[in-house]
Amino acid sequence: GNMFGVKEFHKTANKAGIKPILGCEIYVAKESRFRKDKEKDKKSDHLVVLAKNETGYQNLIKLVTYGWTEGFYRKPRVDIELLREHSEGLIVSTACLAGPVPRAIMSGNNAKAEEIISTYKSIFGEDFYLEMQRHKTGDPEKDERTLKYQEEVNQEIKKLSEKFGVKYIATNDVHFVKKEDAFAHDILIA
């Protein structure tokens, strides 16, 4: 991900009397950020990373920068090593269906989901959250399938939350504010 709009967002929010929450959806390489394997690194997992203080903001900037300068392959990517090194002051959640835990659940690999939760909990402690989503995509052709996957993932998230003592939060997979920006977003991620 990127943080190109942070300065303008921060200024506008403060002007309106709103405390801005600064963060970024980042991509996590399957293994090392340095590996660029055509097949294994085709898709990276998503994580939502929020800064809870100045230290977290500085660490978030470092993660995003390293993603672009060291981990870029199709997209800017970080790895577990960088997350461990720059975890202080950050709040992390498992993101949308393209996050590591939802992907493991959807592939029927609950052992992998548990391993991922253990890893992130060891890095971020109480600042690691599991995400639950239930919303339409805006594309009627995708809605039925997406809602089905979200429901399956949500049921498992509840169980994993209890088993690992990790809280879950309700979120939406939002990437633009105005409906008319959907086309531009689709082009951007194509």
Task: Report residues per predicted region.
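Phosphodiester-processing cores and adjacent nucleic acid-binding clamps
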Residues: 1-190
